[in-house]
């Protein structure tokens, strides 16, 4: 999202800061740009109620991205959970997750915006998997209402409780299917460009943590001296349903558990996380409010049942491991002051998807509806035909046509 933008865009992208007086998870009041009758409110109290129907995802495919970020229709980059014996739970391994930052770290180029590229590549190579759906006398080549990344849905789920970072989501309706792709806001780009060395090292530490407990095959041990290359990844492609909305979701999977009782994906997958060591009640409350919210959203959406977290000392060493069951996380925060409610997250997501269906009415691969939100505001949208906003490349459009 480069170049000159209107004053409206500049207002959308202005970051909001959490001050010490903001103890509630409710977004602060803000002066919001271009409110309209087609806007969607995000106040969490509006979405309280029973948990909506969500059919847990079933995996229909997968793909790998190699060290050069090239797509492969296989599982060559799937890793296997292999923690050292004796420290699977509550251990103190002492791993140095800053080790290798200067010499064994290959960063993905974050200036190259991939959008939906890899999902669309999978769809183009697996057209027969989804079949065709007859609706109103016409066939949909992709038998899903929505196609998107897990990370985009995570942002939507967290919106009622988010107090700092806004988002931009581009939506195109093509052949009866809505494609959702995140656009980087100017505030997010500025934040990324201005990361400190400490922030860069903390990002690295999460990847390095994974290298201590993941092996390349079930019969191998983790290689602690391996190069950390963030170009690499294994992604699952899954089908799910939220009330009336059928979804095709793809998300990166950290590893699979070869000892899992159920070996069918995604129930055998494990999400790996690292976080700062919790040393006092204030840090525990902050962890429960913000980290556990995002962790739950990420894992629940893909149907990943287990999260293994490594807690990091100020010196950069893993001092403890803890396993969380995704289904238990909402119970851990229930009853806490200013806590979050998973039903609110899912109800808002359901409403937002319905909102998209109500306003994105023109079926045109060149047309983009850009939904914008910042804390304290309603979700609004603008419509664009400029090529810079296009999210469906011509090769994909031609393959579907």
UniProtKB/Swiss-Prot annotation:
What's one GO-annotated cellular component?
A: cytosol
Return the annotated region ranges for Disordered: 1-27
Q: Which InterPro entries match?
A: RAI1 (IPR013961), RAI1-like_fam (IPR039039)
One GO term in the molecular function aspect is: mRNA 5'-diphosphatase activity
Pfam families membership: RAI1
Location(s), subcellular: Nucleus
The EC number(s) this enzyme carries: 3.6.1.-, 3.1.13.-
* Record field: compositional bias (Basic and acidic residues): 7-20
**Keyword NADP in record:** no
Primary localization class, coarse: nucleus
Highest taxon, organism lineage: Eukaryota
What family does the Swiss-Prot or TrEMBL record give for this protein? Answer: Belongs to the DXO/Dom3Z family.
User: Which positions does UniProt annotate for Mg(2+) 2 binding?
Assistant: 210, 252, 254
* Catalytic activity field: a 5'-end triphospho-ribonucleoside in mRNA + H2O = a 5'-end phospho-ribonucleoside in mRNA + diphosphate + H(+); a 5'-end NAD(+)-phospho-ribonucleoside in mRNA + H2O = a 5'-end phospho-ribonucleoside in mRNA + NAD(+) + H(+); a 5'-end NAD(+)-phospho-ribonucleoside in snoRNA + H2O = a 5'-end phospho-ribonucleoside in snoRNA + NAD(+) + H(+); a 5'-end (N(7)-methyl 5'-triphosphoguanosine)-ribonucleoside-ribonucleotide in mRNA + H2O = a (N(7)-methyl 5'-triphosphoguanosine)-nucleoside + a 5'-end phospho-ribonucleoside in mRNA + H(+)
Query: In its UniProt record, which GO terms are filed under biological process?
Result: mRNA catabolic process; NAD-cap decapping; nuclear mRNA surveillance; nuclear-transcribed mRNA catabolic process; nucleic acid metabolic process; RNA destabilization
What does this protein do, in the record's words?
Decapping enzyme for NAD-capped RNAs: specifically hydrolyzes the nicotinamide adenine dinucleotide (NAD) cap from a subset of RNAs by removing the entire NAD moiety from the 5'-end of an NAD-capped RNA. The NAD-cap is present at the 5'-end of some RNAs and snoRNAs. In contrast to the canonical 5'-end N7 methylguanosine (m7G) cap, the NAD cap promotes mRNA decay. Also acts as a non-canonical decapping enzyme that removes the entire cap structure of m7G capped or incompletely capped RNAs and mediates their subsequent degradation.
- Which annotated residues bind substrate? 69, 114, 149-151, 235, 252, 273, 298
Cited PANTHER family:
DECAPPING AND EXORIBONUCLEASE PROTEIN, DOM-3 RELATED
The alphabetized UniProt keywords are: Exonuclease, Hydrolase, Magnesium, Metal-binding, Nuclease, Nucleotide-binding, Nucleus, RNA-binding
Q: What is this protein called?
A: Decapping and exoribonuclease protein
Name the cofactor(s).
Mg(2+)
| UniProt binding sites for Mg(2+) 1 | 210, 254, 271-272
Locate the transmembrane regions by residue number.
none
Query: What does the note accompanying the cofactor annotation read?
Result: Binds 2 magnesium ions.
């Amino acid at each position: 999202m480069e170049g000159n933008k209107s004053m409206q865009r500049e207002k959308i992208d202005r970051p909001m800061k959490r001050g010490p007086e903001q103890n509630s998870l409710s977004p602060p009041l803000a002066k919001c740009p271009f409110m309209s009758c087609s806007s969607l409110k995000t106040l969490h109290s509006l979405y309280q109620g029973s948990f909506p129907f969500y059919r847990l995802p079933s995996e229909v495919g997968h793909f790998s991205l190699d060290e050069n970020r090239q797509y492969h229709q296989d599982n060559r980059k799937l890793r296997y959970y292999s923690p050292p014996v004796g420290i699977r739970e509550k251990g103190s391994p002492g791993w140095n997750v800053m080790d290798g930052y200067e010499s064994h770290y290959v960063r993905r180029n974050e200036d190259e915006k991939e959008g939906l590229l890899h999902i669309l590549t999978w769809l183009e190579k697996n057209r027969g998997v989804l079949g065709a759906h007859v609706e109103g006398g016409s066939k949909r080549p992709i038998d899903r209402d929505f196609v998107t990344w897990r990370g985009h849905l995570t942002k939507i789920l967290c919106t009622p409780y988010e107090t700092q970072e806004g988002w931009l989501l581009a939506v195109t309706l093509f052949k009866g299917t809505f494609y959702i792709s995140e656009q980087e806001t100017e505030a997010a780009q500025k934040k990324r460009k201005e990361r400190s060395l400490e922030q860069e090292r903390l990002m690295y530490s999460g990847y390095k943590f994974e290298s201590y407990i993941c092996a390349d095959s079930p019969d191998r041990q983790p290689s602690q001296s391996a190069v950390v290359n963030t170009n690499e990844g294994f992604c699952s492609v899954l089908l799910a349903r939220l009330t009336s909305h059928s979804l095709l979701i793809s998300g990166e999977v950290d590893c699979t558990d070869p000892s899992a009782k159920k070996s069918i994906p995604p129930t055998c997958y494990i999400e790996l996380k690292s976080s700062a060591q919790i040393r006092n009640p204030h840090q525990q409350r902050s962890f429960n409010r913000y980290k556990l919210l995002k962790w739950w959203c990420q894992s629940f959406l893909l149907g990943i049942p287990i999260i293994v977290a490594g807690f990091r000392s100020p010196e950069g060493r893993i001092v403890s491991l803890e396993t969380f069951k995704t289904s238990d996380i909402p119970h851990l925060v229930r009853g806490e002051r200013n806590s979050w409610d998973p039903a609110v997250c899912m109800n808002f997501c359901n409403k937002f998807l319905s909102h998209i269906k109500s306003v994105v009415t023109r079926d045109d691969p060149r047309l983009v509806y850009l939904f914008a939100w910042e804390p304290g505001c309603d979700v609004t949208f603008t419509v664009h035909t400029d090529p810079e906003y296009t999210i469906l490349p011509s090769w994909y459009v031609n393959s579907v046509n």
